[in-house]
Amino acid sequence: MKKLLLVNGPNLNRLGVREVNVYGKGTLATLETDMKHEAEKMGVELECFQSNHEGAIIDRLHEAEDIYEGIILNPGAFTHYSYAIRDAIASISIPVIEVHISNIHQRESFRHESVTAAVCAGQIVGFGFYGYKLALFALMEKLREA
């Protein structure tokens, strides 16, 4: 059975209470449960991880290469400035799909640039929680192509 990793970055533990007009009312627990269920339907095991700490995310990305076949990553605000996370993604050989709940290109100008997207297999933005499912579908297709 394929194993995938879902990584959510800073402040995503606050889903459901943080800026519901931007991120919706769904919680991280709901998102993770829904994603695990979707993965199961595809015959895939999905492990979920969330951290507000850059180093913890980097460590998890490094460890993932030996455990998982691919990663779905929402780096949160680290998207816009974490060259360390960018370099961690670039250093691993498994595909990473970047996902964002909101359309980062329609928000504040500082959110328009992703320093991580260039080293990811793709980026999905603006589809709410459904974007994570799209990322799962895209990642599975990427793995089939390999």
From Swiss-Prot:
Entry EC no(s) = 4.2.1.10
Active site per the UniProt annotation:
23 (proton acceptor), 100 (proton donor)
Q: In which pathway does it act?
A: Metabolic intermediate biosynthesis; chorismate biosynthesis; chorismate from D-erythrose 4-phosphate and phosphoenolpyruvate: step 3/7
Q: Which InterPro entries match?
A: DHquinase_II, DHquinase_II_CS, DHquinase_II_sf
Q: Please tell me whether the keyword Lyase is annotated for this protein.
A: yes
Q: Which residues form a coiled coil?
A: none
- For the site labelled Transition state stabilizer, the residues are 18
Q: Where does substrate bind?
A: 74, 80, 87, 101-102, 111
The entry lists its GO molecular-function terms as:
3-dehydroquinate dehydratase activity
Recorded hits in SUPFAM superfamilies, A to Z, give: Type II 3-dehydroquinate dehydratase (SSF52304)
UniProt entry tagged with the keyword Lyase:
yes
Query: Which reaction is catalysed here?
Result: 3-dehydroquinate = 3-dehydroshikimate + H2O
**What biological processes does GO assign it?**
amino acid biosynthetic process; aromatic amino acid family biosynthetic process; chorismate biosynthetic process; quinate catabolic process
Q: Which UniProt keywords apply?
A: Amino-acid biosynthesis, Aromatic amino acid biosynthesis, Lyase
Q: What does this protein do?
A: Catalyzes a trans-dehydration via an enolate intermediate.
Family indicated by similarity:
Belongs to the type-II 3-dehydroquinase family.
Whom does it interact with, and what assembly results?
Answer: Homododecamer.
The name on file for this protein is: 3-dehydroquinate dehydratase
> Which organism was this protein described from?
Bacillus mycoides (strain KBAB4)
Q: What does the organism's lineage look like at the top?
A: Bacteria, Bacillati, Bacillota, Bacilli, Bacillales
**Gene encoding the protein:** aroQ
